[in-house]
Amino acid sequence: MPLSRLIINNFRNLQSLDLELSPNFNFIVGHNGSGKTSLLEAIFYLGHGRSFKSHISNRIIHYQAEDFVLHARIDEGQHQWSVGIQKKRSGDTLLKINGEDGNKISDLAHLLPMQVITPEGLTLLNGGPTFRRAFLDWGLFHQYTEFYSCWANLKRLLKQRNAALHQVRSYAELKPWDIELAKLAEIVSQMRASYAEGLRPEIEKTCQFFLPELEIGVSFHQGWEKGTDYAEILAQGFERDKAMGYTMIGPQKADFRFRANGLPVEDVLSRGQLKLLMCALRLAQGEYLVAQKERQCLFLIDDFASELDPIKRELLAHRLRESGSQVFVTAITKDQLNQMQWQESEQDSLFQVQQGMLTK
């Protein structure tokens, strides 16, 4: 679903922009601090209701304004959507889809599936399991309509159980939570396992394209011993959980692990190889979405040239162009975009950014 138009008001140093966008590649060139990453951040905010750089909304609102407003037009074949989001310094948020209020962030996220590739994105590989669960759950959200409600209810029950652990004296008092929690945990884990197994061949194929010298393996770990009953584990671990004050075992501990030639990737790959593997994983997931749901996702790539040599940049550009996705790419200079051959395509757009102002 490509964005055909983007309006930004008072988002960081971007005070007033109205952009007509290419459905193919959109290149954003500018010096550090010019506002090029803020443009990607604004697009991300439209699809997630949050920033990928800051959790404090007042830091995102322009210092001279009381709110920021983002608006976009989304085109998909014969269908068109108008989406908008306003965030005030007070913390209030207003969402609109086709002019109607009462929408949720999940509604925006469903309309705008997107993958983000940033220098900080290596946490997918060398960070904690939280980042890899988020990777899996992104795919589940877009593939299974029932996943979001199951996941949200699971989070709610875990929070309630953890609070109850500080109050109950016996397991009998906690058991009503555990009955429902165990059911949801099994459902979410089964969806995660099924999705991970379906995604695995796509990951292996894409990694072979980018890193043919390595054998990349993936494995899903549900967060408790496979083949055991989660309800029994909760009951057996009651005293331990009560002493710790939280639920130690379960789907909230799930992981999706990556190995290179049988070893953890974070232990054996260089920074450049990790960056390429991260790109491969994001591309594989986007292509799997197309294969399963016939839906394209956007790709937001910040600092395209970072830690990739010219040959690897060409490989990434080739694969992105083959995907047919809408892509937004930032770079400091035009020369860094040579591997993407932007000069040869009249269907691409090139924007120059300087002090929050864009010229095409």
Curated annotation (Swiss-Prot):
Q: Does the keyword Ribosomal protein apply?
A: no
In the UniProt record, does the keyword DNA repair occur? yes
Q: List the Gene3D superfamilies hit by this protein, alphabetically.
A: P-loop containing nucleotide triphosphate hydrolases (3.40.50.300), RecF/RecN/SMC, N-terminal domain (1.20.1050.90)
Q: Which PROSITE patterns match?
A: RECF_1, RECF_2
Indicate where this protein resides in the cell: Cytoplasm
Q: Where is ATP bound in this sequence?
A: G30, H31, N32, G33, S34, G35, K36, T37
Task: Look up the coiled coil feature and give its residue ranges.
Answer: none
The entry's function note states: The RecF protein is involved in DNA metabolism; it is required for DNA replication and normal SOS inducibility. RecF binds preferentially to single-stranded, linear DNA. It also seems to bind ATP.
Question: Sorted alphabetically, which PANTHER family does this protein's record hold?
Answer: DNA REPLICATION AND REPAIR PROTEIN RECF
Protein name according to UniProt: DNA replication and repair protein RecF
Q: Which organism is it from?
A: Actinobacillus pleuropneumoniae (Haemophilus pleuropneumoniae)
Protein's gene = recF
